Amino acid sequence: MIIVGGGIGGLAAALACGQAGARPQVLERAATFSEVGAGIQMGPNVTRTLHAWGLAQDLKEIGFVPRKLDAKDTQTGQIIGTLRLGQRSLDTYGAPYFTVHRADLHRVLLKKIRSSGQAELRLDSEVQGLQQNADGIQISGTNLPASLAELSQSAAMVGADGLWSKTRQFVVPPTAPRVTGLLAYRALVPMQSIPEKLRLQDVNVWVGPKVHAVLYPVKCGEYLNLVVVVQGPPPASLDDWDHAGNKQDLEAAMGPIHADLRNMLAAVPAWRLWPLCDRPPIKGPHEMAKGRIALLGDAAHPMRPFLAQGAGMAIEDAAELARSWARADLQVEDRLQMYAQARWARNAQVQQRSIRNGQIFHLQGPLRWGRNVAMKLMGEPLMDVPWLYAGP
């Protein structure tokens, strides 16, 4: 098995499939294995899988277990809903709710793969062409192992190369990702730099007219991860997804906000700006696998971050890919079709719900007040997502 892409999804696939006996080779086009970005939330559906891979202790050493998630109004500062996490996640779903920094999770996966010796990791390697026929697949590119020029009939390729995937074109007709009109300003600051009375032990989601902000501790509570999503035109270059963010532009886009939120954001010395892009929810298994080629994570189903499940769905994909690959009684094509059939509907549902959540977060006028009243009245049952956390 060849895995294209050495991010969180690619390494998760390598670890899971390596444990299933696949002996995967990971091809990463960068010169070093690294992960940039900010924090991620991992619901119990994700941590349950990571624990099954033997990473429970590793997660404790890098992550943070928030007690609860508070939803607040950006203008009044009032708590409009609370979802208990912490012990409730363990009692209800059998696994914890974690917040981590992407780079820390990436490092843990990389360390586990290297210590197991069950996968080969190759840097500075880029797949540029592929031919598939009844006998196998042939790959061309830069700095590839000679053995990849003629792959055996048992060979498969998994595209885990993200939103701007180069391998996606071998499964579905090439189309550009969709520009959402949303901008994410992200930052990571030492918790000590936040005013003491505002330091967090929980996840805070602030919702307001055309804006929302998500704040939570990472790195065992030593840092605060901040994400503010506003509406606005994208930067000129979308291929370069990470840009310097202008603080004045952010403040103008947010409009009036409560003093507590304003004081927390004031502790940020510099912002990074990410234009949010996605694709329409996938419509069937044919968008995740074709012949001996499969797609995983953002290469298959990029999603908006409003359900906090982008990395989670890639990790779930990896676990299902390993289960399907272990079916040695099936041909390679049938194993990949089994994987795609098992995953496409859940991924589509998460994509759809993520879009809907973003719309709810940004409601204005009477609809905003209606949302707030509904959340106050219904509280936890409205905020919990058992169909997601109890799965897959």
PLM segments and residue spans:
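Short, flexible helix/strand-to-coil boundary loops that buttress conserved ligand/catalytic motifs
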Residues: 37, 53-54, 63, 83-84, ...
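Conserved N-terminal helical subregion
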Residues: 1, 18, 43-190, 234-253, ...
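Histidine-centered metal-chelating micro-motifs
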Residues: 165, 184-186, 211-214, 300-301
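Flavin-binding catalytic cores
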Residues: 239-272, 332, 340-341
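Alpha-helical membrane-targeting segments
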Residues: 352, 356-392
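Active-site substrate-recognition segment that forms the wall
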Residues: 201-236, 243-247, 251-255, 276
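Conserved mid-domain beta->alpha element of the FAD-binding
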Residues: 2-31, 158-159, 215, 249-250, ...
